[in-house]
UniProtKB/Swiss-Prot annotation:
Keyword Lyase: no
Organism name: Thermococcus kodakarensis (strain ATCC BAA-918 / JCM 12380 / KOD1) (Pyrococcus kodakaraensis (strain KOD1))
Protein name: Probable deoxyhypusine synthase
Any Gene Ontology biological process: spermidine metabolic process
Any GO CC annotation of this UniProt entry: cytoplasm
Similarity annotation: Belongs to the deoxyhypusine synthase family.
Amino acid sequence: MTEPKDIVLKESEEVEGIPIEGPWLDDVSSLEEVLDYYERIGFQATHLGKAIEIWKKVEKRRAEGKEVRVFLGYTSNIISSGLRELVAWLVKEGKIDVIVTTAGGIEEDFIKALKPFILGDWHVNDALMREKGINRIGNIFVPNDRYIEFEKYMIPFFERVLEIEKERGKPLTASEFIYELGRYMDEKLGKEKERSVIYWAYKRNVPIFCPAITDGSIGDMLYFFKEERGDRELIIDIANDIVKLNNLAVTAKETASIILGGSLPKHAIINANLFRGGTDYAIYITTAVPWDGSLSGAPPSEGVSWGKIRAKADYVEIWADATLVFPLLVWKVMKAP
C-alpha cells in the first residue's frame, strides 16, 4: 500500500521554461518596465505579453518593407468608450489597413464629433433615465439630444447619397457610404472631427466595412427618411462589399487580424481570411466564453479548424475587458522606446 506521504509528495519531473516573476517595484521606474514583466506574470497578463510580442513582430515586418495587411475589427462599445481615440490614432498613423465594425461603431463616432458621451454609473434608476431621455451604455450616459443632432446631419447626407447614386447609376456600397460620410465630416465639422475614426479613415483611404449598417441609429434615420419621403431609391449595397473585403485578404501576402470583442466584425474578418488559407497573425481581446458555441467566444484554435487562422499562425486570445488592456497594448507596441 502506498503511503499517504508518498501520494501527496509524489516525485516530479523538472519543467523547463520561463520562471513566473513579477516586477519588484524598487527595480522599475516606468510603465514600460512593468509591462516587460507581463509575459512572466502568468494568467491573462502572459497573454497580453504575447499580444505585445505578436503586434511588435507585425510592425517590424512592415517597417522592413514586408506586406502585412492589418485588419481591425471592433464592436460598437469600443467607440462608446474612450478607446475611440486610440483607434482613430492608429488609423491616422497608418497602422491599420482595413476596418470592420458594427453600425454603432459608425454612428457613435460621428455623434462624438458633435457632442461628447458622459461618464455615468452602472447603478441607476433606468426607468427614470428613460423619462429624462438619457440612454445608458454600461456606465456611459448618452443624452437623446445627441441623436437629435445626429439626425440634423444625416438627413442632408442621405440626400447627398441619393444624388451620388443617381449620378453614377448604381448604389453605394456600405464602405463607400462610410467613405462619403468621412468626406461629409471633413466638409461640415470643425476641429472635433480630428479625433474621429471615420474622418481619418477617409483621409488615409482606409476602408471601413459594416455589413450590418442598418442595425442602429443609421437604420433609424434611414427609416425616417424613407417613410417620410416615400423613398424607394436610396439603397446601400452590401453584396459588392463582401467581394471587396474578401479580396483585400486574398491579395495580401500576409495578414494580421486584431479583434476587439466578437460578433459580426470578428467573423467578417476571419472569414475573409479563409479565402487565403487563414490569417497569419491574430490577437483577440474578449470577455466572451467558448462553452456556449458562440462565434464571439470561439478561441483562435477553433478558427484553425475552419481554416480561418493558419495552423502555424502566431495567435493569442486575451480574456479581458478591452478598455483595460488595449491602451497598454497600443502604448507598448507604438510608443514605448
